């Protein structure tokens, strides 16, 4: 390394101040105003069934630093530093020793699917033409909303901008937030059943040859976006409330989504990961939902795929856990979302004292749900060759590295990825030998795209 990375000094103890939303004003309206005012901002929220996870929503605006990563390069506020590994270089930028057990700011952004080469140096993956491999904003202040109590909290780490927030709150008292507008048009449709079938058959040949046990193959649809992508997110959050909902806008890059899948969470030393694989559609009523769920739980292909993922998650968590602490807390639950039902399990473990949130996330990246097994073989020699187009942020990680050493990341699926006026949606399905009907796999991809497609359809121009 020819240049020394800057060290960002952050106080150990953050400040928290209670604010008040005027009666009748929602936290969402506050974000509308912030998004219109600040070029770089984020909203992280949840509509999950876990009370702890869904209780808090977080807003950040105008980060103190903007960090981009590509192989061999870490870019900080436009200045490029040659580094051995841009991902692990994040660890060097500050100390992550905040004394708060609550959220106190940190790095918010995404790792693209191609970031796998940061953890597996032998991989040579094609870069996405429109999205950097990694981009994060460092947010040292922001807003936390407690949905249970209605309390609005402003936190900061020495750079207090509470006066700016109060100005926005006063503005909301006087006038309603302006609803964002956007129109979209389809530029490139997804693949036909025939082309997808050829891809599935090609993947099956790799499975038969023993090159992989399971492989995730899919495709994308490309759209032109005119207007504000926040309008699309507003629609998506209404039609597909999910455990992980996010709107992250950094420079020209915007990721918006409603993902059912947690990638990795570290909270006060406990790691959690959630295998989510096995998919069926929603029924027209509760009775059909139950019948479809029962069929899902007795489907040999879906059971085989999910069992493989449980093993992958146990192995991933076990790489950085204290010996003997890894266990499957829940197994084969069925989670229901707006358009699909999934089989879900939970794997937990206690982080080793030699590890941290960066090595913890790295051990789980990317999730086998989006790659297959073994990961290197599936990623480098099969998926990229068969799919042809690089995945970009899809299937990577979106979330936050906290200044207190905790982190939460979701898998960016059921998402829309925008750069300038170009956006895409993508989905994939698992290929397991002996259990594949190409037409079913094609329909699974269509089902997975359904919520984002519906949101986009509601914004199509004349």
Swiss-Prot record:
Its EC number is 4.1.3.27. Coiled coil: none annotated. One of its GO terms (molecular function) is metal ion binding. InterPro entries: ADC_synthase (IPR005801), Anth_synth_I-like (IPR019999), Anth_synth_I_N (IPR006805), Chorismate_C (IPR015890). One of its GO terms (biological process) is L-tryptophan biosynthetic process. SUPFAM superfamilies: ADC synthase. It catalyses: chorismate + L-glutamine = anthranilate + pyruvate + L-glutamate + H(+). L-tryptophan binds at residues 46, 243-245. Mg(2+) binds at residues 305, 444. Binds 1 Mg(2+) ion per subunit. Chorismate binds at residues 278-279, 394, 414, 428-430. It is an enzyme of class 4 (lyase). Part of a heterotetrameric complex that catalyzes the two-step biosynthesis of anthranilate, an intermediate in the biosynthesis of L-tryptophan. In the first step, the glutamine-binding beta subunit (TrpG) of anthranilate synthase (AS) provides the glutamine amidotransferase activity which generates ammonia as a substrate that, along with chorismate, is used in the second step, catalyzed by the large alpha subunit of AS (TrpE) to produce anthranilate. In the absence of TrpG, TrpE can synthesize anthranilate directly from chorismate and high concentrations of ammonia. This is Anthranilate synthase component 1. It comes from Leptospira biflexa. The gene is trpE.
């Amino acid at each position: 390394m020819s240049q020394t990375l800057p060290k960002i000094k952050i106080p150990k103890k953050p400040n928290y101040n209670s604010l008040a939303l005027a009666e009748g004003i929602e936290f969402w309206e506050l974000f509308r105003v912030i998004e219109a005012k600040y070029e770089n901002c984020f909203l992280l929220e949840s509509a999950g069934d876990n009370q702890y996870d869904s209780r808090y929503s977080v807003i950040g605006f105008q980060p103190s630093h903007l960090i981009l990563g590509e192989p061999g390069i870490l870019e900080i506020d436009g200045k490029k530093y040659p580094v051995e590994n841009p991902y692990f270089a994040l660890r060097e930028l500050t100390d992550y020793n905040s004394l708060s057990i609550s959220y106190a700011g940190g790095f918010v952004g995404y790792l693209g699917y191609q970031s796998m080469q940061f953890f597996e140096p032998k991989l040579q993956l094609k870069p996405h033409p429109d999205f950097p491999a990694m981009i994060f904003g460092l947010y040292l202040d922001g807003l936390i909303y407690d949905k249970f109590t209605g309390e609005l909290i402003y936190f900061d780490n020495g750079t207090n901008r509470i006066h700016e927030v109060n100005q926005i709150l006063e503005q909301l008292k006087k006038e309603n937030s302006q609803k964002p507008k956007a129109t979209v048009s389809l530029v490139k449709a997804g693949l036909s059943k025939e082309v997808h079938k050829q891809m599935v058959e090609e993947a099956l040949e790799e499975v038969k040859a023993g090159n992989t046990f399971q492989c995730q193959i899919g495709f994308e649809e490309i759209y032109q976006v005119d207007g504000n992508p926040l309008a699309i997110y507003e629609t998506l959050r209404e039609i597909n409330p999910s455990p992980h909902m996010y709107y992250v806008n950094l420079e020209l890059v915007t990721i918006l989504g409603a993902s059912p899948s947690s990638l990795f969470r570290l909270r006060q030393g406990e790691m959690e990961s959630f295998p989510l694989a096995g998919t069926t559609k929603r029924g027209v009523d509760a009775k059909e939902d139950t019948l479809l769920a029962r069929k899902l739980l007795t489907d040999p292909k879906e059971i085989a795929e999910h069992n493989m993922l449980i093993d992958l998650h146990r192995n991933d968590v076990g790489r950085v856990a204290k010996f003997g602490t890894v266990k499957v807390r829940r197994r084969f639950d069925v989670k229901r979302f707006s358009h699909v039902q999934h089989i879900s399990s939970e794997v937990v473990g206690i982080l080793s004292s030699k590890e941290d949130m960066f090595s913890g996330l790295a051990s789980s990246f990317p999730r086998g749900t989006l790659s297959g097994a073994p990961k290197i073989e599936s990623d480098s020699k099969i998926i990229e060759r068969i799919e042809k187009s690089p995945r970009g942020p899809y299937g990577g990680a979106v979330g936050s590295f906290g200044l207190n050493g905790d982190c939460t990341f979701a898998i960016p699926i059921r998402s829309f990825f925008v750069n300038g006026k170009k956006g895409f949606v993508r989905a994939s399905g698992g290929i397991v030998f002996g259990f594949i009907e190409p037409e079913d796999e094609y329909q699974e991809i269509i089902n997975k795209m359904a919520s984002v497609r519906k949101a986009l359809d509601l914004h199509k121009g004349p």
